[in-house]
Amino acid sequence: KYTPGSFVRTKLRRLILPFIVITTVTFVPRALFDSMSDEPFPLTLDNFGRSLVYQDCMPIPFFWFLQVSFIMLSLTFCVLYFSGSRRVRPAAVVLGLLFLAFLVAPIQVTPFLSIDRVRDFGFFFIAGCLYSLYSARIDRLIPWTDIRFLSASAAAWIGLFLLFEDSPLRFLCSLTGIAMCMSLARIMEERRWQFLDHLKAANYMIFLLSWYFNIAAQQVLAHFVALPWWVHTSLSLIAGIYIPWLGYKYLEKHQDNRLIRITSYILGQSFRKRA
């Protein structure tokens, strides 16, 4: 059973260690290829420091997700842990956090440590926690596997996106998009569509490393070779998924090697020990 200390340490290794290592390794090459990028990225010590703590300065733009995940997971676990020791029901705590997330959503906050993204996505994270508490009841009420529900949620998502893209009500678009994705996933599960199953263990590795191959296919290659846009996009998609997947498989196969274990550790990967 986790304590707050052990839980936070686990998430530091899983999320923050890969963030620091990969950001540091990526910083210099990203700055050297500044001329090929859409936005300036200077090779300075100040910019390096900012790239570790400000989400709008990161060399890999979507790595804010690691900081946000760490903050939300750690805070939520600690709040639930200490409220549980005082015999407060988890549902009451989660509802309180959900209300708090809704209240702070319009407030302007700093991008330091991706706090602004915590504000943006906190409501949806806590809503997911609430769903996990009552999933059995909710699933009885929502026809996830009905094609009509999938179609309706997809239509609502598109319509709300067009209506509220730059509106405070855009969170409705996100909710319908989440419902659409959940419905599609349930339909795939029910019909045993398993063509993506080979990727599931490597999804975190794909997230961590896909950016390199996306950039190589879309920007670096395009700088030297003029190909149709769909070729660059297809190469980016395939390389961004399957090269990290191959890397994961290699680490998994050679986990008895000390260097491989170290590499796996700093990338936040964990493999079951072989019998």
Name what the model sees in each region.
Residues 73-98, 130-151:
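Solvent-exposed interhelical
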Residues 93-106, 148-162, 178-183, 236-249:
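Hydrophobic core of alpha-helical transmembrane segments in multi-pass integral membrane proteins
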Residues 1-11, 21-38, 213, 217-218, ...:
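Juxtamembrane transmembrane-helix termini
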Residues 118, 136-198, 205, 212-215, ...:
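Alpha-helical transmembrane segments and terminal signal-anchor/GPI-anchor hydrophobic tails
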Residues 14-74:
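Membrane-interface helix-loop-helix regions
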